[in-house]
Curated annotation (Swiss-Prot):
It is found in: Nucleus. InterPro entries: B3_DNA-bd (IPR003340), DNA-bd_pseudobarrel_sf (IPR015300), REM16-like (IPR044837). It comes from Oryza sativa subsp. japonica. Pfam families: B3. One of its GO terms (cellular component) is nucleus. The keyword Transcription applies. Residues 8-23, 36-46 have a biased composition (Low complexity). Residues 1-78 are annotated as: Disordered. CDD domains: B3_DNA (cd10017). This is B3 domain-containing protein Os04g0386900.
Length: 212
């Protein structure tokens, strides 16, 4: 008699496989159930636009335009180097300050070559520099012409020192019987050391200070 052999049972194809996923897990979540943070509520967007207005931060109200950028401010006129202004194209003479200019007798002798442009008699004179004016006396004549009786005030107020240069531009004047003289003056600083300024000489251009 043949013995019966027990065969292992084969699961039926209709039975669910242990590895098979639950069909409910494969379903895509609907927008309503997922709560997607990237979607915006149209009603919320409309409310934000209405509350922004013209005063809202970063928003421009409908019907308005952004203000155009302001043009750059024009640069102020550049000051000439060392405060020296361009000449006006008028007659002028230059003078290096000697001791007689910044110490008694406090006077400026005008070069002879400039004499034809100035009155031949004593007249009032005005010097202007940096918005201020100083009155003094101009002494005219054939042999010598000079600025005095008031020049001291100009020299002291502007702290003129030995070696400084001055440019005198004739604004009002002319030969003959002119009633007054007016100069525009510019000062160029020399910065000569005090130990040199104290040496002998330097009262006129004919007697300069000698530097060893």
């Amino acid at each position: 008699m043949r013995a019966a052999t027990a065969l292992p049972s084969i699961p039926s194809s209709s039975s669910p496989s242990p590895m098979a996923s639950d069909p409910t897990e494969l379903r895509c979540s609907s927008p309503e159930s997922s709560g997607d943070a990237g979607a915006e509520d149209p009603a919320a967007v409309d409310a934000a636009e209405e509350s922004g207005g013209e005063g809202g931060s970063g928003h421009i109200a409908a019907g308005t335009e952004a203000a155009p950028p302001r043009p750059p401010e024009p640069e102020p006129e550049k000051v000439a180097r060392h405060g020296v202004l361009p000449l006006l194209g008028k007659p002028y003479f230059t003078c290096i300050m000697c001791k007689s200019h910044v110490q008694p007798p406090f006077q400026v002798v005008v070069p002879r070559s400039f004499a034809p442009l100035l009155p031949s008699r004593t007249t009032p004179a005005t010097l202007s520099w940096r918005g201020r004016s100083w009155g003094m006396r101009f002494t005219g004549g054939r042999l010598i012409q000079r600025l005095e009786a008031g020049w001291r005030g100009f020299a002291v107020d502007n702290d003129l020192r030995l070696g400084d240069g001055c440019v005198f531009e004739l604004l009002v004047g002319g030969g003959g019987e002119q009633e007054r003289v007016e100069f525009r003056v510019q000062v160029l600083r020399a910065e000569i050391p005090a130990r040199i300024r104290g040496r002998a000489g330097g009262y006129t251009s004919a007697t300069p200070i000698v530097i060893d």
